[in-house]
Amino acid sequence: MFIFCTNRYNLHKFAAGTLNNSNYQILIEVPEENSLNDWLAVNTVEFYNRLNLFYGALRSNCTNESCPIMKGGPNIEYYWKRKKKTIPPDYIENVMVLIEKILDNPKVFPPDESVKFPKNFKRVTKEIFTKLYRIFAHIYVCHFQDIENIGAVSHLNTTYKHFYFFSRKFKLIKKREYEPLKFLNIKFEIQEEKKEKERQKQLQENNSQNKNN
């Protein structure tokens, strides 16, 4: 995907490492001396890889019989191109194949800094994130029990929480698309607000101690 030892390769490794860190508000910020497009690119690749692994673990539980509708909630159904009804296994396979082709296209996702990003790069990124979000929604709504059965709830929550805050920060997904998981999103927002208050409190205490010393 990214050429070894290039800045983009190293940035991707950094992004992959941050997905297990809980300080999301800081981690989603663009690192110094890197462009927004670089940051969007490496995180898009990493979120795709992570979600692909989750779905791979669930594939045997998402079948034509057990999962006949590509749902993101009780009244939310996702269609493939031109409002074509598609069963979840086919829909998700179509999405993953399409995204993989985009990620492998060096004109869209340049492997190193010698090639510039296309002018429509953020729009392409938005389309990818929207499609990935719909798969997250389907997994949470229709396969959460399966996730519990394989002991991967905390891993899914960690990945999705990072994905949610990242997509919200850079406005990659339209507000209405968040509807299926809005209660989970609110829960995560409250958690992060609490963490941030605790962090600020700790900083104040540390500053106060330093002054006294």
Kindly give the residue locations of the regions a language model identified.
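Amphipathic alpha-helical interface segments within eukaryotic helical scaffold
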Residues: 52-123, 128-140
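Sequence-level detector for tyrosine residue identity
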Residues: 9, 24, 48, 55, ...
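Amphipathic alpha-helical protein-protein interaction segments
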Residues: 4, 33, 37-40, 44, ...
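Eukaryote-biased recognition of C-terminal alpha-helical segments
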Residues: 152-213
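Chromatin/DNA-recognition segments of nuclear transcriptional regulators
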Residues: 122-173
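The feature captures two recurrent sequence modes
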Residues: 1-83
